[in-house]
From Swiss-Prot:
UniProt keywords, alphabetically: Magnesium, Metal-binding, Methyltransferase, S-adenosyl-L-methionine, Transferase
Sites marked Involved in substrate discrimination: Y150
Protein name listed in UniProt: S-adenosyl-L-methionine:benzoic acid/salicylic acid carboxyl methyltransferase 2
Annotated benzoate binding sites: Q25, W157, Q260
The organism's taxonomic lineage, starting at the top: Eukaryota, Viridiplantae, Streptophyta, Embryophyta, Tracheophyta
Induction remarks: Triggered by EOBI in flowers. Fades out in flower petals after pollination, thus resulting in a decrease in methylbenzoate emission. Strongly repressed by ethylene.
Metabolic or biological pathway, per its Swiss-Prot or TrEMBL entry: Aromatic compound metabolism
Amino acid sequence: MEVVEVLHMNGGNGDSSYANNSLVQQKVILMTKPITEQAMIDLYSSLFPETLCIADLGCSLGANTFLVVSQLVKIVEKERKKHGFKSPEFYFHFNDLPGNDFNTLFQSLGAFQEDLRKHIGESFGPCFFSGVPGSFYTRLFPSKSLHFVYSSYSLMWLSQVPNGIENNKGNIYMARTSPLSVIKAYYKQYEIDFSNFLKYRSEELMKGGKMVLTLLGRESEDPTSKECCYIWELLAMALNKLVEEGLIKEEKVDAFNIPQYTPSPAEVKYIVEKEGSFTINRLETSRVHWNASNNEKNGGYNVSRCMRAVAEPLLVSHFDKELMDLVFHKYEEIISDCMSKEKTEFINVIVSLTKIN
């Protein structure tokens, strides 16, 4: 499985689309706004650029993408008015892997711009937008061309499934029953990927440029702790139930692994300091409930829909597409039972960085 070819959120605007099932991600963007705001204020008030070049890496599609744009424009507009400056030109780069539904994203752009003008007037901008398909573990932009990089709920995804994890049988991710060699392989791949990410962004950002990165993570130093692995363990349970029913072959489940690593703040700090291109301004964690909806009665349904929007393309690349409704029905039942018995939360790691040279 080539991750770059199959990793993307469900496109379009249907029942299983990411656009209609990304409330958790929206809440996280709103929760991290104070950190984003401070980073952008510090950047703008130190450089006062006439053109502000911003990249959203792992932008996906839907309202959340435009929520980020709206936040950043409003922050800059408020700050430039304090100094009596003319509004800068804004140049937003939307980056994601080639399978992302860029068509749906850009079809929504006109309505978003009109709505933004209604809220903050005509005096800002102009705004320019471009789509940049490709892996953010490679170079994406010209040298020293960016002022600000933003990424939310993307950097936990790996560039590939780690090598040497063939013995992770019965699991689809790191789990309490995973051999130590599997845990080490996942961390090794994460360290390689995140180091490359920092290296390439340091080449693309100008001196003093900022990054605000939010990713799924954990507070525990145990990479198999429930706070980061449990959601995937429950999906593995759903798949294994279909194995028991003879609908999926056991070896198919054994051969499937999620290309993701959810780091601790200490791991993020270690890799940033080891790579050496950035200083850490803030490094924090936050929590958000699996069920971001206020509708508690349908918690299992809401969470399974959210996870389907995220994971279905990966699953379809390996399993029969016709089984997806059944897989996520089983998953919903398992999640509902789990949520009735215990507290279920995602842990977010947020880091604000400044490029040194």
